[in-house]
Design a protein with these regions (language model features):
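Surface-exposed, interaction-prone regions used to assemble/regulate multi-protein complexes
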Residues: 2-165
Length: 165
């Protein structure tokens, strides 16, 4: 949660340094992808699921060309999406990608990671996860957190000077 609060403070232009402590993969990965969109989901339950996240302001900070981060969820036993105005959860991966939900925040509820989005809540349960660029290069969570922290520090400095992006 420390990273989430620091990123939110920086986004709001609040003074103070951004501190980074290692957090578990879930829910940290979804918190760092704040404002990113789930563009596509592939795989099967139970099994390995790949979630394609488009988040331009972070992706462009990597030298390799591409548009997405791919979050791989091995041994995934649950992935569903409940629209705020829907009755039944969406479990069809193509339909979930069609909604293109934007990630806001995430929290753990037992073994389930709840990812709160602009139009609903995605719930997932997986033993672990990994991140790679759409070029195939693996990105350790620590590297992604470092890149995100640098982005928000720069954003905060620009906003203090009256020059937000």
């Amino acid at each position: 949660m420390l990273l989430e609060l620091a990123l939110c403070d920086a986004a709001l232009g609040k003074p103070g340094s951004i501190r980074m402590e290692m957090e578990p993969f879930f829910p940290t990965i979804w918190t760092v992808f704040h404002d990113g969109c789930v563009d596509k989901v592939e795989g099967s339950i139970p099994g390995t699921v790949s979630v394609y996240v488009g988040i331009e302001y972070l992706r462009e900070r990597f030298a390799e060309p591409g548009e997405h981060f791919i979050v791989t969820l091995p041994d995934c036993v649950k992935l569903s999406f409940q629209l705020y105005d829907g009755e039944n959860p969406i479990v069809d991966f193509a339909a979930l990608g069609d909604e293109c939900p934007a990630i806001l925040s995430a929290e753990m509820e037992g073994d389930v990671c709840k990812v709160f989005m602009d139009n609903g809540v995605m719930e997932l349960s997986s033993a672990d996860g990994s991140i790679r660029l759409d070029t195939g290069r693996e990105v350790p969570l620590e590297e992604l957190l470092e890149v995100a922290t640098t982005y928000w520090e720069e954003w905060e400095a620009k906003s203090r000077n009256g020059k937000p992006e």
